[in-house]
Amino acid sequence: MVLSSSPQGETAYLDADLKDTDEILAGAARLLDLSQPVGVMLVAVLHMLRDEEDPQAVVDRLMAAVPAGSFLVISHLASDIQQEAMAEMGRRLNQAMTQQFTMRSHAQVTAFFDGLTLVDPGVVLTHQWRPDDEAGAATPGVLWAGAARKD
């Protein structure tokens, strides 16, 4: 709960379908000046879209609507690490939940950043994204993560 704030610290909640980018952008425009660079954060959500729902088009529409200097951040369940364990986890999640998960490979997640400039260290497992200490670097990750700038 925010007890007091300034316009710069304002927050909002938008309940929208990720595929409805027009609604998402309209909601964002009520709070943000979309003529200025912004951060588009698709953290642990794109794996909720099946391939036939065209997650690349969702990313492309969101990034087309924001100006140069904006950033895109993505984290996504990995399909190509610990493959047997991840496949089993995916089966269990998909049995337990009404929303199905689609895990994607490093190459597939990297493709979401096409046309943008990746920030170092690129698309890596979350535990490899600028770890603060050796313990963090040693913890195995199950998500690909990356950030990129729109030039």
Model-found features: residue ranges?
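Alpha-helical subdomain
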Residues: M1-D151
